[in-house]
A protein has these predicted regions:
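Start-transfer (signal-anchor) and selected internal transmembrane alpha helices
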Residues: 1-41, 46, 141, 239-247, ...
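Membrane-interface transmembrane helices that cradle and orient dolichyl/undecaprenyl
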Residues: 15, 144, 173, 183-197, ...
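Interfacial juxtamembrane loops and adjacent helix segments
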Residues: 55, 63-115, 272-279, 343
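Membrane-interface alpha helices of multi-pass inner-membrane proteins
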Residues: 58, 153-158, 186, 196-211, ...
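Transmembrane-helix motifs of polytopic, lipid-linked glycan transferases
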Residues: 120-145, 178, 182
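Short acidic/glycine- and proline-prone juxtamembrane loop motifs at membrane-interface regions
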Residues: 168-175, 298, 352-353
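Perimembrane helix-loop-helix junctions
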Residues: 185-189, 216-249, 308-321, 365
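Membrane-lumen/periplasm interface segments of specific transmembrane helices
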Residues: 208, 227, 240-312, 328-341, ...
Length: 482
């Protein structure tokens, strides 16, 4: 007998005409700033950080039909997108002609690159960001948020998070964010459709091609989805199992074959074998403080919309949605734990929260749940202000010499631009990991401020209409709060 999925862990995502109209409006609201950001970035800035090195892989594929990138660096064949000198990012010997970076991202956007060069890649990234926003909307709508708060949450993620920052850049973290959000959405659906299983299988199979760092995101989603299929139909439904395991298996076998043939190894991280700071070299508690409160690379000063995550989690768990959050913890927990033990948790030369951009959007339900339970004009206004802060910081980055990129500066780059415009000090009042890590007081005071904000949201929350299930029967929606 086929058992139904647990209601507290599944979602009803039956679309309605009103939902489709709301989604269209959401994509328009988010798409215009994203497109403007991408085009401004394209025509006013060279690619920074790892961006040009991903594009070098595309150029090697285009010119030579191979991924031996050394010849692109040696011949300066990258000048179409990076007119200045470019230090090679190549693997350690004996593979010094091969790329340091994963080839999955360049393979995914190679057709846009062939059609439009760097412009095509940035437009591809805008499409990825909009798909992430759309999946966030369907995720939180299916989990019971009303249409208004699902729309607000979508705007918060689309314009108030790392989604906006990285939409105009050729980094691979947005690809992982889309896969994680979509995978979690499929996991929480009331009904697993064959096409969803095919798509999520292909997406999860592509993750380690994009970067081996994303393997800790792939494994939990694969196991949780497999467990759900087994719980609902055992081993009898061969069509479901084939849909789920087929693309995943093909891409996994292809990856193993690629590693063995090209790299003479079965290690998915062989291209970064020279990296000595991957794991277990940092205190995770201290790293967590930096991730949250460091003004330069942390999350909360650049993306204050995530202040709503903790009160949202508390309210949702208290409202009976424990299974959902246990699943969320299982999906993102291993990845976060690994990053917190790495001295490189801050992500190197990049905009803020680069490595965390892969998982931040999946916390959308907690944000939306907090807003819906609060139903307070001031709380909603604060959420809108958080989005405007992120958009303002993103705009100020365009006026900085580094375009918002930093590494060990000890200050938030766009705020330094604002200081120059207003002749006022802002960065001196904020905690800075790389220059003032030994001075704990700024971290303490701002940490207390974060807790106080969470308490305000919790105290403003109205009682849930009925605690318990997030989703309902496939034919109706269950609202999570009055």
């Amino acid at each position: 007998m086929v058992s139904a999925p647990s209601a507290s862990a599944t979602a009803d995502t039956t679309p309605t005409p009103g939902d489709r109209s709301a989604l269209t409006a959401l994509l328009a609201v988010c798409g215009v700033p994203m497109m403007v950001s991408a085009l401004v970035h394209r025509y006013t800035r060279m690619p920074e950080g790892d961006e040009p090195h991903y594009l070098v892989i595309n150029e090697a594929l285009k010119r030579y039909g191979s991924i031996h990138v050394r010849q692109v660096y040696d011949s300066w064949a990258f000048t179409a997108f990076h007119p200045g000198p470019l230090s090679p990012h190549v693997a350690a010997p004996p593979h010094e002609t091969l790329p340091w970076h994963g080839i999955g991202g360049p393979l995914l956007w190679h057709v846009p690159y062939l059609l439009g060069g760097r412009t095509g890649v940035l437009l591809f990234m805008v499409a990825v960001s909009l798909l992430t926003v759309a999946n966030v909307f369907w995720l939180v709508r299916g989990l019971g948020l009303d249409r208004r708060h699902a729309l607000l949450t979508g705007v918060g993620i689309g314009l108030g998070s790392t989604v906006l920052t990285y939409t105009a850049k050729a980094f691979v973290e947005p690809l992982a964010a889309l896969v994680v959000v979509y995978g979690f959405r499929v996991l929480t659906k009331a009904r697993l459709r064959t096409r969803d299983l095919l798509l999520v299988s292909a997406a999860l199979g592509a993750l380690p091609w994009v970067h081996s760092r994303f393997l800790p995101l792939e494994f939990p989603l694969v196991l949780l989805l497999a467990w759900r299929i087994h719980r609902e139909s055992g081993l009898r439904d061969r069509r479901r199992w084939l849909a789920f395991l087929g693309p995943l298996g093909v891409l996994t076998v292809a990856l193993v074959t690629y590693l063995r043939t090209v790299w003479q190894s079965f290690n998915p991280s062989v291209n970064q074998a020279g990296d000595k700071e991957l794991l277990f070299g940092a205190n995770p508690v201290k790293s967590l403080v930096g991730v949250l409160l460091d003004q330069e690379h942390g999350v909360l000063f650049s993306y204050p919309i995530f202040l709503f995550v903790l009160p949202g989690v508390i309210l949702a768990v208290a409202g009976g949605h424990r299974t959902l959050h246990l699943q969320l913890l299982a999906v993102v927990g291993p990845y976060c734990a690994i990053l917190l033990t790495s001295p490189g948790w801050w992500g190197g030369w990049a905009p803020p929260a680069r490595l965390w951009a892969a998982v931040l959007p999946v916390f959308a339900f907690s944000i939306g749940y907090a807003l819906q339970r609060a139903r307070n004009g001031l709380v909603t206004a604060w959420a809108a202000a958080c989005v405007l802060v992120t958009m303002g910081l993103d705009t100020l980055c365009r006026f900085s010499p580094s375009n918002g990129f930093s590494a060990d500066y000890g200050y938030l780059v766009p705020l330094r631009v604002l200081e120059g415009l207003t002749h006022r000090s802002f960065t001196g009042y904020l905690p800075a990991w790389h220059t003032r890590a030994e001075a704990p007081w700024p971290f303490l005071w701002w940490g207390l401020a974060v807790i106080a904000f969470g308490l305000v949201v919790l105290l403003s929350a109205r009682p849930a209409a009925r605690p318990g299930p997030v989703g309902g029967a496939p034919s109706s929606r269950t609202r999570v709060a009055a």
